């Protein structure tokens, strides 16, 4: 009996160490490299300084931004929740926020935490192309998918109640004399593992409420307009921290 107790105690210690390692993994807390700008450090101050509401057709919020600063359930520091009351019931586009700066090619790091099962948000590249954040779904509309187009090559989501990270390398669409010659491409690392490798993005999905060009030719009418990094509000407690972007020239 004593040996069984010792074995059980050791297993709990190892399990605890595994959890600790998971939340102190190298993909979390990544510092912004030279030339990058930190857009969200988890504080309301950084939120209001660097972000604005995206005022699309469904916009229903009012300034100032109502995404609240809350306490990080893991580390105790400040984080920002996407649970804006204007987006209650899954009204994407009603209270989404976007960086004031706009980009063409860029690299970005985004850390997120889903508080409850079914939590839903999303990261939009150039305020066009969505990388899904959705607990409980691994389809083309599920976690880490390039929405409606590309499944992740592996399941790297750590689950509800843990921090996760996207590292993004984005190449904007190319144009010559106003004509689209190359579609946008993205490489995505999820919790340190490459899950999308320079995949081509065909269009904007979700209609005009989803972002720039969503209403152009059913989302296929991509224009040569830069856009910000956008975070989606759907009335869920999805927390964000440590978001930085580096423009690539």
Provide a role label for each language-model segment.
Residues 1-7:
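Bacterial N-terminal signal peptides that target proteins for export
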Residues 19-249:
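Carbohydrate-interacting regions of secretory-pathway proteins
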